[in-house]
């Protein structure tokens, strides 16, 4: 049920008079870098502020809500047996659950939900598949963690646990489906890598314990353009499309290795190996390079930067900190689960801490404990010169960008017993935040 209070007050930062387009059409936005641009979406609010609306979402899911053609879309997994995800301490950090997933006994509806941005009312709900998964997931994860994406006339969804990709119109009518099979994952944590849409190409990553495939599909019918294979190994990091000195490349991070492929042909252009752990967070890039942070829950891992324009095997010799191809590398720097953001030459990583680096040199500018007494799992957003991240308890932490640390603002979402692992999304004048139970809208939808 959607709840709309009579009075709504918030403190919004007016960043520019130029409005951005309303669409936020794939994971981390159209540019895949979490930059909202000029917006009057609220970045903080006073204690006790009510949302514009709150809508309970059936089932469970950590997919980011997207906004396309004046509608909100998200995915969810619905079963007769309640299966709300647990937080970090009740899930990932609980040793009794590691590698011991609770296998579902009831069929699950893998569904898409469309909501009205003004009221939060559910407009329609459509199941693209119904099945009992043959692979497990961790107590912290869901069977609907992959974020959908949208073009001007088509919505694309992916449920990695069963391997189904579906295309539908904005009324929920299915255009085509493709099935690639289930994905067994490391420690039975479950899946998480989202689709990537670039023009008429749809990229599907299937890095799991049985296979290592990256596929490029035609958006018109789901047929496969190319497949790039590598050794098996689970990755939860969503690929990015990077303009590498005029060539559009798909950069995919998997177990111990990052590889850049030509988007048109699927041919490998470069690879960086020697990265010892798996990937939970995705990459960021600019014209100067691509910035890599490996991450596993509870472990520290290397971060590094690959210079633009490189070809071949870029793997550093053991103990090396840089090369002609690698701008810099740091060991045991702990990227965390949220994907980083890049703002005016500065690289920000979030997790248990907030860490800022100079993107060109790797110099650490500051490292501070994450406010709110817990970590963040969802990715941050960049709104003007503000960086916003939601920790798992629902505290919205807003940091002003810059090499000098300034104590962040903290805004609370009153959500007793709910967890927040999904990445928030922005509309022109509103912020969308998903919890384990509901979707919240703050601002003026």
Outline where the language-model segments fall.
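N-terminal secretory signal peptides that target proteins for export/translocation
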Residues: 1-5
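Bacterial N-terminal signal peptides
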Residues: 6-18
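Noncatalytic, solvent-exposed loop/strand surfaces
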Residues: 20-445
């Amino acid at each position: 049920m959607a709840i709309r209070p009579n009075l709504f007050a918030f403190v919004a930062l007016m960043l520019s008079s130029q409005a951005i387009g309303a669409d936020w059409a794939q994971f981390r936005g159209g540019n895949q870098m979490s930059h909202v641009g000029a917006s009057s979406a609220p970045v903080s609010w006073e204690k006790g502020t009510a949302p514009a609306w709150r809508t309970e979402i059936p089932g469970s899911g950590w997919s980011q809500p997207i906004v396309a053609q004046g509608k909100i879309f998200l995915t969810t997994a619905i079963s007769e047996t309640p299966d709300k995800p647990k937080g970090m301490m009740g899930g990932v950090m609980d040793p009794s659950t590691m590698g011991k997933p609770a296998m579902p006994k009831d069929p699950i509806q893998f569904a898409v939900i469309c909501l009205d941005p003004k009221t939060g009312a559910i407009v329609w709900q459509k199941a693209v598949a119904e099945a009992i998964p043959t692979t497990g997931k961790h107590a912290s994860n869901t069977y609907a963690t992959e974020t959908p994406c949208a073009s001007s006339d088509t919505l694309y969804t992916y449920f990695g646990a069963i391997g189904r990709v579906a295309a539908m119109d904005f009324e929920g009518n299915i255009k085509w489906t493709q099935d690639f099979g289930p994905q067994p994952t490391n420690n039975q944590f479950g899946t998480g890598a989202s689709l990537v849409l670039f023009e008429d190409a749809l990229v599907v990553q299937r890095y799991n314990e049985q296979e290592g495939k990256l596929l490029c599909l035609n958006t018109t019918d789901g047929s496969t353009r190319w497949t790039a294979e590598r050794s098996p190994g689970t990755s939860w990091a969503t690929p990015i499309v990077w303009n590498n000195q005029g060539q559009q490349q798909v950069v995919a991070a998997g177990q111990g290795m990052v590889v850049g492929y030509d988007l048109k042909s699927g041919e490998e252009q470069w690879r960086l190996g020697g990265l010892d752990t798996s990937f939970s967070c995705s990459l960021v890039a600019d014209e100067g390079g691509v910035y890599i942070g490996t991450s596993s829950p509870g472990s520290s891992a290397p971060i590094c930067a690959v210079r633009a324009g490189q070809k071949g095997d870029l793997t550093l010799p053991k103990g090396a900190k840089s090369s002609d191809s690698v701008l810099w590398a740091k060991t045991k720097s702990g990227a965390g689960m949220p994907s980083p953001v890049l703002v005016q030459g500065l690289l920000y990583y979030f997790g248990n801490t907030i860490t800022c680096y100079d993107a060109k040199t790797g110099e650490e500018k500051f490292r501070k404990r994450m406010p709110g007494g817990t970590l963040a799992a969802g990715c941050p957003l960049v709104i003007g010169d503000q960086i916003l991240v939601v920790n798992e308890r629902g505290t919205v932490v807003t940091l002003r960008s810059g090499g000098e640390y300034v104590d962040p603002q903290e805004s609370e979402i009153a959500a007793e017993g709910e967890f927040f692992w999904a990445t928030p999304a922005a509309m022109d004048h509103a912020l969308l935040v998903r919890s384990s139970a509901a979707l919240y809208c703050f601002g003026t939808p």
